[in-house]
Amino acid sequence: MIELSSDPYVLKTRNTPLTEADFRIHLNINWCRGVLFNVVAMKNSIAVVEYDAILWSEDSIMFIEYKDSPAAYKDLSSRRVQQMNSFAKNIARGLGFKSFNFVVVVKGLEESTSKGGVMVMPLVELGSYQPNFVSSITELEYLDKMIAKYTRAGEAQFALDLEKLRKIFEIEQA
């Protein structure tokens, strides 16, 4: 079993359920450099979340939760999806990835939707899915919110100064 560590998280692989065979067949791995299936994320030796797949490239990482039926998906609460998204962001940042994506994939789902602010897609769309990565760096997100706020308020010069600060921060992160 593979184990990756980045304080305070440890990622460990687990056994693969047979119900995930369809999921693996539909998974698009053309864009990534590596994949781990069935990963348990532990924080301080306590399992906090499981992901059915983690895919990564040079600077981005994607976390996937798979449900093998719409009924199993309905049992997944919005709060839990938000927690899984938050853990994904923290793990991505801890492992040094600049951007991340978390998505829920459901076998038998009719159309894409969202739950807890996270994209939920049918399994049949997974093969053509191009991840929409977002920043794992909280400070950049906050700067984006401030830029939008001051742009709406008509404070164009201040928004431009914040944009310069954002670019400086991005260069230092590179």
Which stretches of residues belong to each language-model region?
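Intrinsically disordered, low-complexity Ser/Thr/Pro/Gly-rich regulatory segments
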Residues: 1-174
